[in-house]
A protein has these predicted regions:
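Pyridoxal 5′-phosphate
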Residues: 1-244
């Protein structure tokens, strides 16, 4: 369900801090067990981090309900929106999440740049994660003070070219119309799913009721890399093997 970017950092943090990482189960259809998720939450829960749309299964998670459940025990929430933002309308205010992150390359923009939304009150409380130029207000050998938001978190020379490219990608997507993009992709998803189901020996992975335009599948007796090579020779682009 989750991208490695929403697994590995928390494992590393738990190793450093002694925190415990808990994982909510999914069912055979690739859908989150929402009641099991709620059962994992307690007043000791500090952060609930989850994807909005799975990059591997296409499952669209019930993020509003998940945010509400986490807030009910006083936990902060972070949503990985990398697979959602380019394909559907997203309103972080309506979701009521504390943090929301997505990448530039999934938005058809440059690599090496992304976006992190955070509630202003939380960002003001947080210390800088990196030191350097621009993130300071004053500097002396006796001590330094930090700049205002968002510059407090932008140490050093930023990825200027990447930011310009990301802005152009956003403009292009907005010109297409995100609702039109979503409708077109859902039509393609329905057609592709129906066609794939008709192929003998092909098994779809994940059959959630609400899906983004992602389909994972395997073929009986055929290694995914071999299948990918054959499809590539026919001009069909697929992703095979280990996802990130």
């Amino acid at each position: 369900m989750e991208h490695h970017a929403n697994i590995v950092p928390w494992q590393m943090l738990c190793e450093r801090s002694g925190a415990t990482l808990k994982v909510a189960p999914i069912d055979a259809r690739g859908e989150l067990d929402l009641e099991a998720f709620r059962a994992l939450l307690s007043p000791r829960t500090r952060l609930a981090a989850f994807t909005q749309v799975s990059n591997a299964l296409g499952t669209v998670l019930p993020v509003r309900e998940m945010v509400a459940a986490a807030k009910g025990v006083g936990a902060l929430t972070l949503i990985d929106g990398a697979q959602a933002v380019p394909h559907q309308r997203v309103d972080v205010q309506a979701l009521r999440c504390d943090f929301y992150a997505f990448s530039g390359n999934k938005l058809y923009g440059p690599t090496g740049i992304g976006v992190l939304y955070g509630r202003e009150a939380l960002l003001r409380e947080m210390p800088p994660w990196q030191g350097g130029g621009d993130m300071i207000l004053t500097v002396s050998f006796a001590g330094s003070t930090w700049n205002e938001l968002p510059w407090k978190f932008e140490a050093g020379t930023p990825n200027i070219a990447g930011a310009v490219g990301l802005g152009a990608a956003v403009d292009w997507l907005e010109a297409l119309g995100i609702d039109a993009v979503h409708a077109h992709e859902q039509a393609l998803l329905a057609r592709a799913t129906a066609q794939l189901r008709s192929i003998p020996g092909l098994r779809l992975i994940g059959d959630a009721a609400h899906k983004g335009a992602v389909i994972s599948f395997v073929m009986d007796g055929v290694h995914p890399h071999d299948l990918g090579t054959i499809l590539d020779a026919e001009g069909v682009a697929v992703r095979t093997g280990h996802h990130c």
